[in-house]
Amino acid sequence: GCGGNGLVLSATDSRACRKVAVKKIVLSDARSMKHALREIKIIRRLDHDNIVKVYEVLGPKGSDLQGELFKFSVAYIVQEYMETDLACLLEQGTLTEEHAKLFMYQLLRGLKYIHSANVLHRDLKPANIFISTEDLVLKIGDFGLARIADQHYSHKGYLSEGLVTKWYRSPRLLLSPNNYTKAIDMWAAGCILAEMLTGKMLFAGAHELEQMQLILDTIPVVREEDKEELLRVMPSFVSSTWEVKRPLRKLLPDVNREAIDFLEKILTFSPMDR
C-alpha cells in the first residue's frame, strides 16, 4: 500500500521471526527529506501500546542509517505489521457501539502519550489509525506530518497548505493554519468517533469554505473573540443569532446521548474548551 509519504510493503524479519511493514521513503528533494527527517526523529522517541512500533530505520540495501539522511536517496522504516486500518474497517460498514468505544479509548490513550511527549500528530484520520483484528488493538501511525510542540524546537510553525485532510481539520486550523495546539488532534479524534458510530464522515466539505460552513451549522460559537474573528473574516457564514441549524443531537439522531455528550465536549469551536 501507500502511506502518507511513501510506499509500504509487508516483509518477514528472518532474524526476529516476525512479519513487519517496511515503509520506503524516497528522498528526492528537500521537502521529502524534511518530512522524512521529521518522521524519523519523532518515531524513534515513541514507545507505547497504542503507537505503531518502529524497529529500525535503514538506508539503501539495509545499511545502517547513521547521522543525517542527506547522503541517501532512500530510507526504509521497518515497523510493526498491522493487518488493517480504520478506513478499511469503516468501508465494510458501521462499527458496533462497543467496538467504537474500545477503539476511541485506545486512540485517546495513544494521543495522551504523544501529547505528553510534546508531539502533535496533525494528520489524524482513519487511514492513519491501524487495527489488529485478532486482538482489536488500535495503534496510531504515519507520523509524516507530526510536529514537535516545543517552543525551543526550531520550526516556523506553519502547516503546509493542503497537507492535512480537510474533513478532520478543526475550525481553528481552517481559520489560521499557523496557529495550532494539541487540541487539533482532539478535534480530529471527535470526528473519527462520529464516523465510527455512523459510518459517515461528520463534516465532508468539498473545500475549506464549505468545511467551515458545515462546522458552523452544527458547532456553536461561544467565545466573543471567535465571534469577532468570524464577523471580520467571513460574516456571511454566521447567523445573526449565533444559533446553529443542526446541533449534533439533530445531525446524529441515532447516536446515544452519552456519546453525543462526549462529542459536544471534544468538538468545541474554541480549542481552549476542548
UniProtKB/Swiss-Prot annotation:
One of its GO terms (biological process) is intracellular signal transduction. GO terms for cellular component: cytoplasm; nucleus. It comes from Rattus norvegicus. Phosphorylated by PAK1, PAK2 and PAK3 in the activation loop resulting in catalytic activation. Phosphorylated by MAPKAPK5 at other sites. It holds the Pfam family Pkinase. Residues 1-274 form the Protein kinase domain. A motif (SEG motif) lies at residues 160-162. Activated by phosphorylation in the activation loop. One of its GO terms (molecular function) is protein heterodimerization activity. Its cofactor is Mg(2+). It is an enzyme of class 2 (transferase). Keywords: ATP-binding, Cell cycle, Cytoplasm, Kinase, Nucleotide-binding, Nucleus, Phosphoprotein, Serine/threonine-protein kinase, Transferase. Atypical MAPK protein. Phosphorylates microtubule-associated protein 2 (MAP2) and MAPKAPK5. The precise role of the complex formed with MAPKAPK5 is still unclear, but the complex follows a complex set of phosphorylation events: upon interaction with atypical MAPKAPK5, ERK4/MAPK4 is phosphorylated and then mediates phosphorylation and activation of MAPKAPK5, which in turn phosphorylates ERK4/MAPK4. May promote entry in the cell cycle. In contrast to classical MAPKs, the TXY motif within the activation loop is replaced by the SEG motif, whose phosphorylation activates the MAP kinases. It comes from the Eukaryota. ATP binds at G1, C2, G3, G4, N5, G6, L7, V8, K23. Belongs to the protein kinase superfamily. CMGC Ser/Thr protein kinase family. MAP kinase subfamily. This is Mitogen-activated protein kinase 4. PANTHER family: MITOGEN-ACTIVATED PROTEIN KINASE. It is found in: Cytoplasm; Nucleus. InterPro entries: Kinase-like_dom_sf (IPR011009), MAP_kinase (IPR050117), MAPK_ERK3/4 (IPR008350), Prot_kinase_dom (IPR000719), Ser/Thr_kinase_AS (IPR008271). Homodimer. Heterodimer with ERK3/MAPK6. Interacts with MAPKAPK5.
